[in-house]
Amino acid sequence: MDQTSIQTSDGEAATANTLKYMPGFGNDFETESLPGALPQGQNSPQKCNYGLYAEQLSGSPFTAPRGTNERSWLYRIRPSVRHTRRFSNASYPLWKTAPCLDEHSLPLGQLRWDPIPAPAERLTFLEGVRTITTAGDAATQVGMSAHAYVFNEDMVDDYFFNADGELLIVPQLGAIRVFTEMGIMDVEPLEICLIPRGMMFKILKSGEQTVWRGYICENYGAKFTLPDRGPIGANCLANPRDFKTPVAAFEDKETPCRVHVKWCGKFYVTEIGHSPLDVVAWHGNYAPFKYDLRTFSPVGAIRFDHPDPSIFSVLTAPSEDAGTANVDFVIFPPRWLVAEHTFRPPWYHRNIMSEFMGLIHGQYDAKEEGFVPGGISLHNMMLPHGPDALAFEKASNTELKPVKLDHTMAFMFETRYAQQLTKYAAELETLQDNYLECWDGLERKFDGTPGIK
């Protein structure tokens, strides 16, 4: 990519050292990459400075309540109507959309996979998305899909926007550069980023490894927001100041480019003669952001018992039923375990919610073996799950002194809807055939006599 064609708010080429961000969650931001490009006192002047075009990008209906009303005003080199021409059909057969009831022979059950294989061919991020599960219905804007991605090639002249939902990207191996209409974000493992529905972007490699891998939650429903803290109060969990939105940056490039679109589960492509990432200035609250998971401030039991995992929610996308999420993004970060007379790992559970889990690095305390970084587990609604036999015996017999659970970061996409497995996931070579055996060592201890066994 020609770095000299990219200009940031400092008028410099966009390098890792020059990228800047604006702190806050849901703020009404303003930023310009050329002085005076942002109109003051109005949104739509008769003529914009620098010959720019004013355009509004709406993330909510005009009449949504003020607290959930989202829109941004963009001041760009060309209006978006010039960024699409006649569309033709495109195909990304491994990226599926709900409802998706693929036919496969894998029966219902608790499932776990090792990391998806590195590609033998050259793949961009867009070409490297592999859907594992789908839930709900994208056309009616409910539910989500869980994907893995693996790629090794930059999206140089290829751009993409997703009309079906917002994308929460969780890198696991390799940092990525996410160049959106509204600015540039460098995102490394242990960070996440969110790209709003309908926003144009491309993704580039960062670093020197041979493969880049991670996870994606495609949220079809109401957008992700911060969960209510309730009696926790005004602090802890994910604090708003730790979310970072990029400053304005634009790519001024007059070369053949392709714009790819996902709309109602189908893919289309159109060819244009310039970069669509041409927003010189913008203001508003509909914007991408990134977040460092290491800044999450966990709370937990400081005397006894194991609290519900909802205390580890970073973001939640609500449904129409209060307290029932369309999808939650939950992490299991480093933390101190201090509970007395308590089985400290997550307890055995059957749940109305369906849980897709991934591991960014380290070990997960309920599954010290078999669940590896880059791996995936799926525990669908009402299917039992919990610590394996090794973790149970260890936690049941260990000395209960304060212990720091360190060097770990697991996460969960949890939804109220059943997660339907794709044919790709059902037939993936990394599926662990012996996963259920992890509980085989949990033998009967009950013999009818009182006392600790």
UniProtKB/Swiss-Prot annotation:
Function: Involved in the catabolism of homogentisate (2,5-dihydroxyphenylacetate or 2,5-OH-PhAc), a central intermediate in the degradation of phenylalanine and tyrosine. Catalyzes the oxidative ring cleavage of the aromatic ring of homogentisate to yield maleylacetoacetate.
Record text on subunit structure and interactions: Hexamer; dimer of trimers.
Chain residues that bind homogentisate: Y364, H385
Keyword Metal-binding: yes
Protein keywords: Dioxygenase, Iron, Metal-binding, Oxidoreductase, Phenylalanine catabolism, Tyrosine catabolism
Entry protein name: Homogentisate 1,2-dioxygenase
NCBIfam families: hmgA
Cofactor dependence: Fe cation
InterPro entries per the UniProt record, alphabetical: HgmA_C (IPR046451), HgmA_N (IPR046452), Homogentis_dOase (IPR005708), Homogentis_dOase_bac (IPR022950), RmlC-like_jellyroll (IPR014710), RmlC_Cupin_sf (IPR011051)
